Every structure is written in C-alpha cells, then in structure tokens.
Amino acid sequence: MWRRIVSSQLKTLAADVVAASPRRSIAATTRPVGFYLAANRSAISASSFVIPRRFSSDSVETPATKKVEDVMPIATGHEKEELEAELEGRRLDDIDFPEGPFGTKEAPAIVKSYYDKRIVGCPGGEGEDEHDVVWFWLEKGKSFECPVCTQYFELEVVGPGGPPDGHGDEDDEHHH
C-alpha cells in the first residue's frame, strides 16, 4: 500500500514538474519542489497525505537532492532501491524484462545485468517458434546459443560487476 501511495506521489510530482517546465528536465529545474506543489496543489489527490508533509520548500532545495528518507523514512532494501531509482527518473526493473529482436550470431540479444553473470530464460521466438523456457547462466564475455531455437545471447554489465553472490570464483574449491 505504501509503495502505491509513494509511487503515485512521485509520478504526480514528476508530471507537475514536467508540465511546469516542458523544455527542461527535472534535474535541470531550479525551482524548489515546494513551489510546484504550492502552485499545483489541486493536482494532488486528497489521499496523498504524505506529500504535503514531506515535500516542502523548507526541506528541499531541488528535486535532484530529494532522498527516499524524505518521502518514506521506513523504506529499506529493495523497496528503497526502487524508490531511489524512481526519484532519479529511472526504473530499476528496466533490466529485468529484456525485449528485442531474435538474437543471431552477428547480432545477439543483449541481456543487461548488474553482475558478471546472470540466469536467463529463453522462451524461443514468436508464435510457432516458442518453446518451453530453457534456463541457463549467461556470463560476461561469452555468447550463449539456445540449444532449442539457436537464438544467441550476450551479457552487458550495467552495474558494479563481480559475482552475484558476492564471493569470488576462487572460493568454489573450498566448498567441495
């Protein structure tokens, strides 16, 4: 419930800022968030009780300095990461649902990851070319060809890199 309320608050805030300055990005806007809220208070629904207390010109100088703690002080973990990303104008799950053309050897399907390897599932192509999902580890610097539909995949690291479990590969020999 909180996530829905805060998410709708952020979308309303972003829409108000964009509407107030159509040629400038949120980060480039120099007016405080409280200015937009005061000018557009009618655009905010009655159920948005979090915004008037948290977004004010006293606590915020620019939208770029807004922190999750100002919007929802109890957010932690993945929820906090999602809210931080939304405040920055990006969606955290953009890398979780890759879309694109069928991957070939010359132009493989690119799958984004925060780490050097990731589990990926291949459902095949469209329509008659679909098959049961084939799950596999996709690793940085290595192409993978689906054994059923021959689609090619490659990993693009967009985060810190390293192993997803936080341990180096050299630790594997100690767990046998």
From Swiss-Prot:
Covalent S-S links between cysteines: none
Location of the protein in the cell: Mitochondrion inner membrane
Any Gene Ontology biological process: mitochondrial electron transport, cytochrome c to oxygen
InterPro entries: Cyt_c_oxidase_su5b, Cyt_c_oxidase_su5b_sf
Gene3D superfamilies per the UniProt record, alphabetical: Cytochrome c oxidase, subunit Vb
Gene Ontology terms: cellular component: chloroplast thylakoid membrane; cytosol; mitochondrial inner membrane; mitochondrion; respiratory chain complex IV
Amino-acid positions noted as binding Zn(2+) in the UniProt annotation, renumbered to this chain: C122, C146, C149
Location of region: Disordered: 157-176
CDD domains reported in the protein's UniProt record: Cyt_c_Oxidase_Vb
One of the Pfam families matching this protein, by short name: COX5B
Keywords: Membrane, Metal-binding, Mitochondrion, Mitochondrion inner membrane, Transit peptide, Zinc
Family named by the database record: Belongs to the cytochrome c oxidase subunit 5B (TC 3.D.4.11) family.
Classification via PANTHER family: CYTOCHROME C OXIDASE SUBUNIT 5B, ISOFORM A-RELATED (PTHR10122:SF0), CYTOCHROME C OXIDASE SUBUNIT 5B, MITOCHONDRIAL (PTHR10122)
Function per UniProt: This protein is one of the nuclear-coded polypeptide chains of cytochrome c oxidase, the terminal oxidase in mitochondrial electron transport.
Protein name: Cytochrome c oxidase subunit 5b-1, mitochondrial
Originating species: Arabidopsis thaliana
